Amino acid sequence: MAHSVSSVVNKQLLAYIKESSELMTPKDIYVCDGSAEEYHNLCELLVKQGIFTKLNETKRPNCYLARSNPADVARVEKCTYICSEKEEDAGPTNNWMAPAEMKAKLNGLMKGCMKGRTMYVIPFSMGPIGGPISRVGVEITDSPYVVVNMCIMAKVGKKVLDLLGVDGTFVPCTHSCLAPLEEGQKDSTWPCNIDNRYIVQFPEEHRIVSVGSGYGGNALLGKKCYALRIATVLSREAGDSLAEHMLILGITNPQGKKYYITAAFPSACGKTNLAMLNATIPGWKIECVGDDIAWLKIGKDGRLWAINPESGFFGVAPGTSYKSNPNAMKSCEKDTIFTNVALTEDGDVWWEGMTKEVPKGKIITWLGKEWSADSGEPKPNLAHPNSRFTARVENVPVGDPGYYALEGVPVSAMIFGGRRENTVPLVFQSRSWKHGVLLGSSVASETTAAAEAAAGQLRFDPFAMLPFCGYNMGDYFGYWLSFADKYDEAKLPKIFHVNWFRKDNGRFLWPGYGENSRVLKWIIERVEGKEGIAKETPIGYLPAKGALDLSGLDVPEADMEKILTVDCKAYLSEVEKIRQYHSKFGSLLPKALIAELDALEQRLKAAL
């Protein structure tokens, strides 16, 4: 039978299924084949169970809405662990517990936890099946919601089993909602066990176990758990690879020459918007390879090549509109799973920021409560601030053909950036690869008044990887630095830093969105070695006067002056903040990184 364990021949997988079923005692076992028919059947099952609502087939063909438990709505960093053999290998940015202690805890929670449920076995490939940068995982879960989302987010099914063959290896990813069902017991519409959430990575074993949560980032284990936390470990072991929280975009100039750029930004800095940008400058075209994760590897030619290991977008819905990101909106017009957004009277979805006006008629909020604009009741959050859409990469109208390339795409430039109201210029280029690593290690965003910390405080998020690095971040900086020693720096990507968010008296100085293509144009011209377009400053290379293409753009010269000037005095206090942050890594902070920061300080002092 196609979906029974008898269809499995891989030795590691057979042992994994046996060990999992003996511990968790499911009522039956189902091996996923990744077919459209299977997806349809599971969605129908989820509708029957009350977990999915089918949306209006005319407005949103083949789309469904799910509502989670109100307490299970986001990644939970406090419940996320890197259980390395030694505590120092997890480092100061990760939670740690001794592996033996964690396993005892998990085994206690998982004994019989799938009682009355089906155990789904999901063989998946991160990246094109059989590609040199791609890797395989198998997720075992008791959640059909996880299965259908994984079928969008990764390449699932028989081809992966064929690739594994008898002796192939994979990363085992075990997930359970920890909600066993007794005979005749009515099931919940969102099984979870909030008080027992653990999202655990065992780096030496290349193994993931996540229990208690049914939510995306905690339950779709191919995503952050594998594609970043375990993949950072695998990449360092390989010695020639990186696994990064980066978008990948293709940019073609008017002469038809194409380049690829990766970019890492902390959350709420517009990563998906940049990945799906519509360029505003004539003759330039931007296409999307991926919006969240990049796996990179040095190719035979000495260049760094990248793949998007995912096959879908798990996008934040609120704030996404036809104005802010038309391509993201088009990508979720069909074949999409929505989680925790509002349901309109005509069977469509809505979220804050989608349109100026709230739709007329009755709306069911993400909490399943009825509300309407004319009810006289104050408007609640109709969609949860972290509500999501899960859509296929193929749906995006600006998809880049490089997404399908087995060997990936060659990367010419890397961008880091944060949300900074002052000090940090619109764009600058690092002086070298090692100086670029300093930029990555000091990525930061200012907290807003809405955050718990005082407004204007810096929250550092090195490489935008703070919650996602699977080993000690000091070692991670050292591994990045090693690329300059091991490889020809001339062939490595040029590194840049951007900041779209400079303000003056509360007013943004740069229009952002599609106009950011003007900054990408300058970056590509720097990659091409165009003369006379950059000026050297203590922090790196900035656009020379007149070098940024501002044609047809109405930005006052005084504003451009502000965002393209280095305030050395303000930057010296920046250096102090970076030094203070770096001190948390103690003796594992690489000396070469300290030397880069010292040199930056000297250049700034000399320029005063």
UniProtKB/Swiss-Prot annotation:
One of its GO terms (cellular component) is cytosol. The active site is at C269. One of its GO terms (molecular function) is manganese ion binding. Its cofactor is Mn(2+). Pathway: Carbohydrate biosynthesis; gluconeogenesis. Mn(2+) binds at K224, H245, D292. It comes from the Eukaryota. Binds 1 Mn(2+) ion per subunit. PROSITE patterns: PEPCK_GTP. GTP binds at A268, C269, G270, K271, T272, N273, R388, R419, Y513, G514, E515, N516. Signal peptide: none annotated. The keyword Nucleotide-binding applies. Keywords: Decarboxylase, Gluconeogenesis, GTP-binding, Lyase, Manganese, Metal-binding, Nucleotide-binding. GO terms for biological process: cellular response to glucose stimulus; gluconeogenesis; glycerol biosynthetic process from pyruvate; oxaloacetate metabolic process; propionate catabolic process; response to lipid; response to starvation. Substrate binds at R75, Y215, G216, G217, S267, N386, S387, R388. It catalyses: oxaloacetate + GTP = phosphoenolpyruvate + GDP + CO2. It holds the Pfam family PEPCK_GTP. Its EC number is 4.1.1.32. Catalyzes the conversion of oxaloacetate (OAA) to phosphoenolpyruvate (PEP), the rate-limiting step in the metabolic pathway that produces glucose from lactate and other precursors derived from the citric acid cycle. Belongs to the phosphoenolpyruvate carboxykinase [GTP] family. Monomer. This is Phosphoenolpyruvate carboxykinase [GTP]. It comes from Neocallimastix frontalis.
